[in-house]
């Protein structure tokens, strides 16, 4: 294990390689036989399950229900909404045949040319079209509204440059699709779900985010507005961590979804969609982890506490086992997930390094002297600090420590992010500062042409027009740093994943 840890590239040497090493060595995920598709390993999936469980609870608390819609979408459905199909056309995987057959030369199976589909099917890149075709059958009257549906699913988008969790051809996500009687209700829903995502990111992931609206050039294909939460990684790059879209009546018109309103008049339905994906795993890893491995927030750690015994003989181990049994029971009563690793096939030092690599928030160690003194050694993963504490009331001590760790890693990430937010007024200064990374607040004239020029010349994009103020005067009008034309307010630029 010492060698494996040594092989973990340091962030300062190659941040990208550090991330790749960590995902594999911490047993989170690995590449598969299919290019661009990943295998999420049990430990990585356990983290995703905790994310999924918490988000699902938050969705249900806001009145949403889960449903499931088909993986395969008729090609004609994508043609109904012009902007939408243009946004996804190059990424779509297409099913053209419904059957294979044995090759005549015995070399294996081949596509049966006689089994060509009358209409090709698209493996869902997102589900707006298939869902709105379904909603047409569900909605006739204002009494049928609102519909607040969420789907947990996989989606597929061909990606040329893939990275585990951050950008893969197939990924897991949730997608909410809601239908409303009024524009106001739909807009409120889009903001409500953005706030749910922000609360989840900050309270559970301990990842500080900026809430804002995307520029027209960056918004979701087919949306009137796209709201986003943007996080900053340790290399100063932005990661879009969740989006919520106000779709207006575009999809209702495309699929002729109308309802009779309270005035007994026909009207098109208003819509939203919103989603987060396994990209959140990448955000979690890159925001908190260090050169020793993962640093997981206790709220999402599959194992919050690990206990490791150090013993000289089997008799001593039995005494430690008996002592630890009660501690484990009391920790579990407090809802803390705990693992007692008394397996004899690995040395304590190996276990320490392994659990450190996997980001377990708290490690408890009991040896022979601890047994005599009724103490345990406690190590917290976020700071690597150690302390010897009494076993009396240790469950309460650990419970408080987990909350302290959760708060500390959020504070650390927030302090770092805030220190990397810069304000610039000239394009020359912008080009200099963007090389250093971080978020840059600058004036922009609101045109696609200027936005594209900045992107082409610096690889920086407008992450969002933020809702909150970061520096005095950033919400006041000014002059575009590139053209000198009027600008309504400063926007956030950054290079991104």
Curated annotation (Swiss-Prot):
Its EC number is 6.1.1.15. It is found in: Cytoplasm. Gene3D superfamilies: Anticodon-binding domain, Bira Bifunctional Protein, Domain 2, C-terminal domain of ProRS. The keyword RNA-binding does not apply. It catalyses: tRNA(Pro) + L-proline + ATP = L-prolyl-tRNA(Pro) + AMP + diphosphate. One of its GO terms (cellular component) is cytoplasm. GO terms for biological process: prolyl-tRNA aminoacylation. Keywords: Aminoacyl-tRNA synthetase, ATP-binding, Cytoplasm, Ligase, Nucleotide-binding, Protein biosynthesis. One of its GO terms (molecular function) is proline-tRNA ligase activity. It comes from the Bacteria. It is an enzyme of class 6 (ligase). Catalyzes the attachment of proline to tRNA(Pro) in a two-step reaction: proline is first activated by ATP to form Pro-AMP and then transferred to the acceptor end of tRNA(Pro). Consists of three domains: the N-terminal catalytic domain, the anticodon-binding domain and the C-terminal extension. Belongs to the class-II aminoacyl-tRNA synthetase family. ProS type 3 subfamily. NCBIfam families: proS_fam_I. This is Proline--tRNA ligase. It comes from Bacteroides fragilis (strain ATCC 25285 / DSM 2151 / CCUG 4856 / JCM 11019 / LMG 10263 / NCTC 9343 / Onslow / VPI 2553 / EN-2). The lineage of its organism: Bacteria, Pseudomonadati, Bacteroidota, Bacteroidia, Bacteroidales.
């Amino acid at each position: 294990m010492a060698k494996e840890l040594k092989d973990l590239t340091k962030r300062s040497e190659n941040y990208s390689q550090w991330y790749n090493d960590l995902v594999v060595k911490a047993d989170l995920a690995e590449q598969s036989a299919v290019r661009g598709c990943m295998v999420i390993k049990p430990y990585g999936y356990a983290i995703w399950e905790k994310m999924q469980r918490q988000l699902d609870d938050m969705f249900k608390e806001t009145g949403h229900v889960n449903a499931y819609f088909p993986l395969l979408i008729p090609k004609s459905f994508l043609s109904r909404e012009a902007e939408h199909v243009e946004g996804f056309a190059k990424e779509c995987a297409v099913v053209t045949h419904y059957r294979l057959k044995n090759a005549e030369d015995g070399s294996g199976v081949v596509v049966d040319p006689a089994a060509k589909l009358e209409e090709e099917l698209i493996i869902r890149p997102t589900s707006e079209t298939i869902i709105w075709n379904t909603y047409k059958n569900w909605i006739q009257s204002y009494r049928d509204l609102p519909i607040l549906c969420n789907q947990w699913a996989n989606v597929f988008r061909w990606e040329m440059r893939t990275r585990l969790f951050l950008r893969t051809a197939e990924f897991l996500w949730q997608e909410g699709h809601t239908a409303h009687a009024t524009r106001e209700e739909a807009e409120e829903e889009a903001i409500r779900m953005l706030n749910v995502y922000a609360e989840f990111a900050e309270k559970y992931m301990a990842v500080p985010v900026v809430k804002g609206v995307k520029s027209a050039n960056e918004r979701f294909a087919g949306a009137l507005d796209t709201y986003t939460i943007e996080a900053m990684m340790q290399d100063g790059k932005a990661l879009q961590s969740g989006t919520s879209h106000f779709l207006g009546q575009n999809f209702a018109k495309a699929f002729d979804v109308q309802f009779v309103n309270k005035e007994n008049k026909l009207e098109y339905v208003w819509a939203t969609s919103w989603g987060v994906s396994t990209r959140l795993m990448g955000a979690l890893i890159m925001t908190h982890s260090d050169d020793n491995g993962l640093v997981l927030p206790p709220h999402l750690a599959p194992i919050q506490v690990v206990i490791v015994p150090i013993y000289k003989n089997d008799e001593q181990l039995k005494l430690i086992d008996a002592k630890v049994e009660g501690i484990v029971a009391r920790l579990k009563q407090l809802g803390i997930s705990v693992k007692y690793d008394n397996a004899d096939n690995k040395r304590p030092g190996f276990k320490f390094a392994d659990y450190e690599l996997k980001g377990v928030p708290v490690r408890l160690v009991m040896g022979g002297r601890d047994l005599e003194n009724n103490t345990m050694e406690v190590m917290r993963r976020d700071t690597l600090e150690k302390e010897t504490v009494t076993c009396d009331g240790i469950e309460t001590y650990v419970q408080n420590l987990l909350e302290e760790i959760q708060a500390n890693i959020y504070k650390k990430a927030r302090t770092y992010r805030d220190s990397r937010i810069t304000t610039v007024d000239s394009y020359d200064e912008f080009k200099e500062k963007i090389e250093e990374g971080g978020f840059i607040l600058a004036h922009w004239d609101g045109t696609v042409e200027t936005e594209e020029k900045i992107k082409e010349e610096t690889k920086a994009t407008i992450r969002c027009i933020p809702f909150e103020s970061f520096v005095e005067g950033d919400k006041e009008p000014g002059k575009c740093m590139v053209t000198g034309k009027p600008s309504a307010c400063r926007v956030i630029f950054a290079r991104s994943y």
